[in-house]
Design a protein with these regions (language model features):
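Acidic catalytic patch
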Residues: 38-41, 61-94
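Short, well-structured N-terminal submotif of metal-dependent ribonuclease cores
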Residues: 1-39, 51-63, 128-129
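Alpha-helix capping/helix-boundary segments
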Residues: 8-9, 40, 83, 104, ...
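Short glycine/serine- and small hydrophobic-enriched flexible loop segments
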Residues: 46-53, 109
Length: 135
């Protein structure tokens, strides 16, 4: 299991240069399951909408991309909602993160799972918290 930040999946579907893509896809297509907090799909869909607005994607692309993503072994963690009342804001304060990013950190800590992220602030906080980074 690994925790998947929306930055990684957006870079993958938007064909941005990023080193995690091939290895992540290999692991997801074999045995790896990605855990994501409940707000993950909102971040992904918002990122796709922004890509359409910026003309990086055609208007019909997000639906096809979401179909592709939905076929990946991604498990939405509903416990994130419960943790948002206490642990997540504490992590956000301790590491100077948004609560959205702190939710990824909380999930990685709780699951004792590596974190896949392209966000440098989140990666730095993960290292400080003893979380292994994927890639």
């Amino acid at each position: 299991m690994l925790v998947l930040d929306s930055s990684v999946i957006l870079a993958w579907v938007l064909d941005d240069e990023q080193p995690l893509g091939p290895e992540l896809l290999r692991r997801l297509s074999t045995t790896e399951v990605a855990a994501v907090p409940v707000h993950w799909i909102l971040e992904v869909t918002n990122g796709l909408r922004m890509a359409v607005r910026r003309r990086r994607l055609a208007p019909g692309d997000p639906r096809r991309i979401l179909d592709r993503i939905s076929n990946q072994p991604i498990q939405v963690d509903t416990e994130t909602v419960v943790r948002a009342w206490r642990e997540t804001p504490i992590l956000a304060d301790d590491h100077g993160l948004t609560t959205y990013d702190a939710a990824y950190l909380e999930l990685a800590i709780r699951l004792d799972a590596p974190l896949a992220t392209l966000d440098q602030d989140l990666a730095s906080a993960a290292r400080k918290a003893g979380v292994t980074l994927f890639g």
